[in-house]
From Swiss-Prot:
Family according to the record: Belongs to the glycosyltransferase 2 family. OpgH subfamily.
Source domain of life: Bacteria
The protein's role, per its UniProt record: Involved in the biosynthesis of osmoregulated periplasmic glucans (OPGs).
Mode of membrane association: Multi-pass membrane protein
Transmembrane helix listed as a keyword: yes
Subcellular location(s) per record: Cell inner membrane
SUPFAM superfamilies (alphabetical): Nucleotide-diphospho-sugar transferases
Taxonomic path: Bacteria, Pseudomonadati, Pseudomonadota, Gammaproteobacteria, Lysobacterales
Gene Ontology biological process terms in this record: glucan biosynthetic process
Residue ranges, annotated region (Disordered): 1-28
Gene giving rise to this polypeptide: opgH
Entry keyword set: Cell inner membrane, Cell membrane, Glycosyltransferase, Membrane, Transferase, Transmembrane, Transmembrane helix
Keyword Cell cycle attached: no
Protein name: Glucans biosynthesis glucosyltransferase H
Amino acid sequence: MDGTVTLSPAPTDLPPVSSLDAGQPTLPPEAPLAMPEQSLREGSLQVRHQRTSPMGIGLRRFYLIGGTLTATAVAVWVMLSVLWPGGFSVLEGCLLGLFVLLFAWIAMSFASAVAGFITVVARAGRKLGIDPDAPLPSLHTRTALLMPTYNEDPRRLLAGLQAIYESVAETGQLEHFDFFVLSDTTREHIGRAEEQVYAELCDSVGGHGRIFYRRRADNAARKAGNVADWVRRFGGNYPQMLILDADSVMTGDTIVRLVAGMEDNPDVGLIQTLPAVVNGQTLFARMQQFGGRVYGPIIAFGVAWWHGAESNYWGHNAIIRTQAFADHAGLPSLRGRKPFGGHVLSHDFVEAALMRRGGWAMHMVPYLQGSYEEGPPTLTDLLVRDRRWCQGNLQHAKVVGAKGLHWISRMHMMIGIGHYFTAPMWGMLMLVGIGIPLAGAGIDLAQGLPFSPARYWHGSSDGNAIWIFVCTMFVLLAPKLLGYIALLLNPRERRACGGAIRAALSILLETVLAALMAPVVMYLQSRGVFEVLAGKDSGWDAQVRDDGKLSWPALIRSYGGLSVFGLFMGTLAYLVSPSLAAWMAPVIVGMVVSIPVVAVTSLRRTGLALRRAGIFCIPEELDPPKVLVRASELRRAAALEPPLI
């Protein structure tokens, strides 16, 4: 695997080279790699301490866990001072248990965000000799860029790939790269369109013999199976593979630096970038990409700081050592029926864990810019994707106990599982918090006695309940505050986000909109958890990439029941006590207005109006990199062509 293999151009009129392929593939000679299925019942951790692990990684993790436990212990002690006087009921015990778990959850995020903030402000955390400001290194090995696709618009898809191809060519090192479109498309008319657009792309850029296309006849194991099929057939020609998503765009500069990082660090198995979300047009997409651009680095630098050489894999915009992947990332089929059994859905976490078990270092480089993706245009589209992620993360319950995994790899999976269980836990915490004063007050609903949860909690603890609420909200919102402070300290980023005042207004509006959507997300994530536990499979559909166009009937079908439930609960609370209704208002209002909120945030004109006002601006809009400009030009031109699908 010295990267010296030369690929000869493949004619475009060849029949399928394998019974594994459908349609008319155009492929290089095969160079198979064995990719054995890994056992979850056997195995051992090959290397405990990686050479590339940062100094003091043990102290970093001690800070994270120790800080989380200390903050949680203090909060629990104060909560006990609220609950203990006058006895300790079953409901209060439930409240305390939920509070411990949820406060520990947000305390860990807070501790990680603080570390990320310090790293960002200090401009530290650079790894593996990858310096974005240094001259572009020269490469010595071959790398394959893989773009899996599933029932996507081929013109839109290959416009992004063409922009990447041209950007790599501008580095002067195109000879070190080949590009593969790996289709799992099941709709025949889309498959034929893919072949046509692929041929047009090769003619346009002179990519024959360097850009290849393959569609699987059987798309078993979804994306993981798609990539594994390529590794088993062609991986021997390429020491590295860079995995893209259908909406991924990366600069040639960033790609070259990633490859050089792999060449210079032979014990590194994977390098994950931090993709910036771009090209949002709707209000929802723009608030998401603004939040990711301002708060995202704080969170990403924080986790990279304590992950060290045991980082995670997000499934795309990452470079992987092909041999290491083949040797250790062959996924087994999980025992049992769907949704917990069968093929591994959230394969990226598991592949990273197995590669780390095999002795390879896994790193994240959040400081390396030039990596981009797109977000869902509407809350509805986000929640559809989130339902699939929910099933994939809960499925990790069957993997987390696998033999030989590094404890940080297990922690990644537990965090993924916990993310979805926090939604029903927040709902239960709210209900129990209301139920305790209701039970203690002995309410007679027929008389409609005056009742105030706020007064109950405040009076029972000399204000400690209010103190807990304030501290909880501070810990919850701290990443936003830290992201804003970091933005203020970076003049270029601050100007690119509209300036200090507009950025502050953007954060305020994003926080309000997120609060209004939170009850909807909490309800649907909770429903997703219960559906998975009840055995309901999420399926696999193509994602919506362009602006959402949600009809009112669709909105009513999706959120009408939640709105009616919110009205019912609000009315019932008001009949008990207006103060109780006021206490529940933050949740009830979000439920009641879910239809108009989702409708307004799904509009392109709303998002663009705020952009003109300088709200939710990101640096990639003020000074877009050439690769994004080119991708947008190509996609606009493609949109003018006669439709193929």
